[in-house]
């Protein structure tokens, strides 16, 4: 991002997350897409082509998507995993893994409390902070990647986890399962976009169009086990993936949760809260 803002890079295609797209649009860092070069856009599920971070997909197209949830060991956790509150259950002390990621960890806590994960209300944010400080003695570790090995080795009972990672873990250990709590979650999107610093906009659009070919989208999704927004790719995926309700939930996806939005200057308040939690 810093390189693009400084104009010192020649990237033609970038793959930002949804809240970064919103920020980059606000800073006029992205080209508008010429859909005359993107005829494969028709392959995308319409549920994903007009979301809050980029209305009418003027500057980006979705590449992969998924949810945040809880991956858990069915032998260690026998009750329903239907609420974020289970991450605060004292009987799992020392067996809970949380993400070392401020927006994700604070976000699911806000959802547990009934608030938006994009809140700018300091009272709500402080309530989430106190909940996470209270949870800290129960937490085995705050991780980003190494939690996966611990879940496979059955060293922990549960972990905050992205949906695609959960599917890979379940492939490695059949005792693991994935759940999306009923309070709602984060819907995330990785996207494809063209920065204004690109010197090859038309060629970049042709590459994005190539990535939206059903067989290419299916290969990418199958390899990393994250959901594809390409509706024509679903029939090319392994049946166990295409019919997995945690990878491909049906209906109105907005009922599952929220997309992270760019918080602007208020991001510093989340950073301060996260520092207080980690240092408590």
Identify the residue ranges that each predicted region occupies.
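Conserved C-terminal helix/tail region of periplasmic/extracytoplasmic solute-binding proteins
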Residues: 250-280
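Early extracytoplasmic/lumenal segment of secretory-pathway proteins
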Residues: 1-23
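A bilobed periplasmic-binding-protein/Venus flytrap-type ligand-binding module shared by bacterial periplasmic
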Residues: 69-76, 111-114, 188-203, 208, ...
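Ligand-binding pocket segment of bilobal, Venus flytrap-like solute-binding proteins
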Residues: 97-101, 105, 109, 117-183
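A conserved helix-loop-strand patch within extracytoplasmic ligand-binding domains
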Residues: 37-97
């Amino acid at each position: 991002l810093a390189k693009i803002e400084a104009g010192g890079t020649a990237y033609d295609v970038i793959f930002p997350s949804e809240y970064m797209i919103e920020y980059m649009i606000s800073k006029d860092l992205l080209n508008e897409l010429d859909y005359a070069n993107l005829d494969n856009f028709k392959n995308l599920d319409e549920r994903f082509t007009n979301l809050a971070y980029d209305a009418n997909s003027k500057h980006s197209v979705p590449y992969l998507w998924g949810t945040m949830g809880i991956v858990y060991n069915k032998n260690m956790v026998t009750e329903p995993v239907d609420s974020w509150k289970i991450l605060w259950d004292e009987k799992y002390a020392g067996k809970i893994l949380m993400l070392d990621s401020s927006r994700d960890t604070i976000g699911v806590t806000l959802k547990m409390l009934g608030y938006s994960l994009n809140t700018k209300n300091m009272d709500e944010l402080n309530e989430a902070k106190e909940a996470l400080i209270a949870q800290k003695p129960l937490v085995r570790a705050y991780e980003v990647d190494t939690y996966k090995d611990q879940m496979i080795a059955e060293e922990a009972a549960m972990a905050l986890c992205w949906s695609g990672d959960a599917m890979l873990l379940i492939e490695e250990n059949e005792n693991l399962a994935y759940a999306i709590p009923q309070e709602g979650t984060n819907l995330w999107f990785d996207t494809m976009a063209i920065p204004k610093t690109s010197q090859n906009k038309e060629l970049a659009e042709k590459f994005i169009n190539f990535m939206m070919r059903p067989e290419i989208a299916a290969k990418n999704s199958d390899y990393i086990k994250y959901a594809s927004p390409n509706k024509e790719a679903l029939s090319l995926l392994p049946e166990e993936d295409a019919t997995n309700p945690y990878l491909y939930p049906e209906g109105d996806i907005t009922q599952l949760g929220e997309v992270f939005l760019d918080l602007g200057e208020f991001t510093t308040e989340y950073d301060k809260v996260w520092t207080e939690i980690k240092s408590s």
